[in-house]
């Protein structure tokens, strides 16, 4: 299991947990909108570090953004497997072609 798969499994396991026992459970208990807001904040922080060129800070913020992306998706019952399947369906297709077909 990759670290991303492990993270997704942990997030999934926390969906029914007591919000007092887990940051993930607490975030999920606040609903999809709050999860989306938090993802947006973390994405902006990653963008800032990318612009600044701080590799270590970008790596850290990217990890935070990935975590919050998975939490946001879990809040809407979209799993990492769902995302991987979507990516697999796009494999071998030019990005320009894929975008034109939307």
UniProtKB/Swiss-Prot annotation:
Broad EC category: hydrolase
Pfam family, any one: PRA-PH
InterPro entries: HisE, PRib-ATP_PPHydrolase-like
Source organism per UniProt: Jannaschia sp. (strain CCS1)
Catalytic function, reaction form: 1-(5-phospho-beta-D-ribosyl)-ATP + H2O = 1-(5-phospho-beta-D-ribosyl)-5'-AMP + diphosphate + H(+)
Keyword terms: Amino-acid biosynthesis, ATP-binding, Cytoplasm, Histidine biosynthesis, Hydrolase, Nucleotide-binding
Compartment(s): Cytoplasm
EC number in record: 3.6.1.31
HAMAP family per the UniProt record, alphabetical: HisE (MF_01020)
Gene Ontology MF terms in the entry: ATP binding; phosphoribosyl-ATP diphosphatase activity
Record protein name field: Phosphoribosyl-ATP pyrophosphatase
Pathway: Amino-acid biosynthesis; L-histidine biosynthesis; L-histidine from 5-phospho-alpha-D-ribose 1-diphosphate: step 2/9
Biological process per Gene Ontology, one example term: L-histidine biosynthetic process
Predominant cellular place of this UniProt entry's protein: cytoplasm
Taxonomic classification: Bacteria, Pseudomonadati, Pseudomonadota, Alphaproteobacteria, Rhodobacterales
């Amino acid at each position: 299991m990759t670290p991303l798969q492990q993270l997704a499994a942990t997030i999934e396991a926390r969906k029914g947990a007591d919000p007092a026992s887990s940051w993930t459970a607490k975030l999920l208990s606040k609903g999809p909108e709050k999860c989306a807001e938090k993802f947006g904040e973390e994405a902006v922080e990653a963008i800032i570090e990318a612009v600044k060129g701080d590799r270590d800070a970008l790596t850290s913020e990217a990890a935070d953004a990935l975590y919050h992306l998975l939490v946001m998706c879990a809040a809407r019952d979209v799993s990492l497997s769902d995302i991987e399947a979507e990516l697999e369906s796009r494999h071998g297709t030019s990005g320009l072609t894929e975008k034109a077909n939307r």
